[in-house]
A protein has these predicted regions:
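Solvent-exposed soluble domains appended to multi-pass membrane proteins
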Residues: 1-248
Length: 248
């Protein structure tokens, strides 16, 4: 069913909305599911309108950046665009040195760094206020009995650190970054961090999430087993996913 999402908020504010993902539309049923999330365009690997190149196993990040730039330039309205990249996803036992998973991973992220820098430099030349928010979901999954994680003594009891990710925020115009959170926060707050940064409109739900971030910045028993259940967050999640969406 259709649900209020971050994309639908931007759509209500007059933005065109797009989701770009350089992989199969059927994976995780993304095409069917994301059609309910308020995106005007869903662009999967078969829908790209720029030349496609691969790096490692998957479509390279440079191709995704090129597609994003093309959409920005072709869209007359303000654009909210969400993309999930694939280049640096497992498996890492590829190429000339399949046994050197760590080396392959470092090579791939170096490649992304170079292309991301070029992407940002291109956005500097775009005559539209533009903000980029980039975040990962977890560190790489490395196999083997003597992987770096084994050497660090990581196991199922202490692997939560793999999901503690830094983020990058960049804009081609002056923004006040003084209010950016300096402490750790759960990833589901990230859209509201961005909304606060650009001074987006706030309805009661957005304000409630921003208030919750002040009092409960991290909500995860994997991060801290002593964190109790938060009834407000649980009810809001239920309402948005399974309930009658009375919180809109």
């Amino acid at each position: 069913r259709a649900q209020p999402t971050i994309a639908s908020y931007y759509k209500d504010w007059g933005y065109s909305t797009a989701y770009v993902h350089p992989f199969m539309s059927s994976f995780y049923s993304r095409e069917r599911v994301y059609a309910n999330f308020g995106f005007d365009q869903l662009i999967f690997d078969e829908d790209f309108t720029v030349p496609i190149e691969y790096y490692g196993t998957y479509i390279e990040d440079k191709t995704v950046f090129n597609q994003v730039e093309k959409l920005i330039k072709e869209t007359d309205e303000p654009l909210f665009l969400h993309t999930t990249t694939m280049q640096n996803h497992q498996p890492y036992d590829q190429g000339e040195n399949p046994e050197d998973e760590m080396g392959n991973y470092f090579q791939w992220i170096e490649h992304t760094g170079t292309d991301f820098e070029a992407f940002i430099n291109n956005l500097k030349e775009i005559d539209e206020p533009t903000v980029v928010f980039m975040i990962g979901d977890h560190y790489p999954s490395l196999k083997g009995e003597n992987s770096v994680y084994d050497q660090l003594g990581m196991n199922g009891d202490n692997c939560g650190v793999l999901y503690e990710q830094p983020f990058i925020v960049w804009s081609n115009y002056d923004l006040d970054y003084s209010g950016m959170p300096q402490e750790k926060f759960s990833t589901f707050y990230a859209p509201y961090v961005l909304m606060d940064l650009i001074d987006a409109p706030r309805d009661s739900f957005i304000q409630a999430m921003m208030d919750k971030m002040e009092t409960t910045p991290v909500y995860s028993t994997n991060y801290d087993a002593s964190v109790g259940r938060d009834e407000d967050l649980d009810i809001l999640t239920y309402d948005r996913i399974l309930g009658d969406i009375v919180s809109s």
